[in-house]
Each structure stands twice: as structure tokens, then as C-alpha cells.
Amino acid sequence: MSSLTIRDQKTDDLLTPENSTVIIIDYQATQVGSIESTDKYRMVQNTIALVKLAKVFKMPIVVSTVNVKTGINGPTIPQIAHEVKDLPSYDRTTINAWEDKEFLEAVKATKRKKLIIAALWTEACLLFPALDALKDGYEVYPVVDAVGGTSVVAHEAALRRMENAGAQPTGIMSLICEIQRDWGRGETVPGMLGVLAGIGNGVGLSVGYRQEP
């Protein structure tokens, strides 16, 4: 039972802690409250899991909001804000985060070409930066079970448009497994199991039971 030598984490075709950036856009009360394409609670839990995953594996996280400083919108919801409280949050007036100077500079500063993106709504604040990032040579991985739209058809149409442009949809369970990759990498297993336990689906509940004394 021997694992192969770990591939170069910076050049690996799969997502790794050293070649990927996690981007969280517009998880604010107005946006979360207007989601109609999926279960809001599960969506938020999956987004929290995404942030926790990035923290366990020390991946860069870029956080952005829209229209907080103008007074039109509120800040990132507390459940997620608690997890990113030590990180800068780039507030914008642009619906497309890729057209905001500070946000774009923050993404470029990570020097990572694989972008794992969760944003609300799917049909706007996820779709637009995803298309622009693809055009600029980035690989884009929308986290489909951590995002939502104002309707099922709008959400699904936006995902199709991104995929047709070259985006590679993924989900939170797939990401957790892809980033961990090998149970033999024991230093991150406890943190990874903690992320799994917090999701609340069948796998998360099973892990939670196993972790109980």
C-alpha cells in the first residue's frame, strides 16, 4: 500500500493547495435571501466548508462584497464573515468583480491560475468574472453546490454558459477530496475531517459521528 511520489503541487493539472485560489463573492443578506435555485442553508454551509478547506490547506482567499460602502447593501453574512474576519474584503460598485481594480489586483497577487469561485448570484456575480477570468487565461472552477441563482433556470443557464466558455464545474465534496488527495498526507487529515463534519450531508454526519468520543 504505497502512494506514488507527490506530484509537483504548483504544476499539477488537478487542483492543489499550491496552485489554486479560493474566491468568495457577495455572500450578503440580500443575495442569500433571494436565492430560489437551491436550499439556502445547505448552500451557506457548503460555502463555509469551502472557506474552512482553504484555511486548513493555507490556500489564498479573496473576499469581495458589492455596495456596502454606498449603503445600498449589507456586509458579508455573519456565518461566513466569522471565517474570513482576518482577511481584507474588497467592496465594489461593479456587478462584475473582474472590473474592480482592487479585487483584480488581489487575484493577480496570488500568482495562481486556478480560481475556485463561489459567488451570488450565479447568473451575475459568478458568471461575469468567470467569463472574464477565462478570457484572461485563468482556469475557473465554479463550486456548484455553494452558489445559487434567483431561479433554477437562471442558475442552470449561467452554469451552461460558463461551462461552454471553458469553466470546469465542481462541488464541495469533490474539492475536499481533490485538495487532500491522499489519506497518507496525515498532517491535514484532522482539519479535512473537520471540514467534512461541518457540511451536514450524509457524509458529513457520518464523519461527525465517528469523531464523537
Segments (PLM) and residue ranges:
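Active-site-adjacent betaalpha module
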Residues: 2-21, 57, 69-213
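Short acidic, Gly/Ser-rich segments with clustered Asp/Glu that frequently serve as metal-coordination loops
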Residues: 28-34
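Short acidic catalytic loops
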Residues: 21-28
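Short, well-ordered turn and helix-capping elements at secondary-structure junctions
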Residues: 35, 65-67, 94
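A cross-domain feature marking catalytic cores of carbohydrate-active enzymes
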Residues: 27, 63-65, 144
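A short alpha/beta connector and helix-capping loop motif
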Residues: 18-20, 35-63
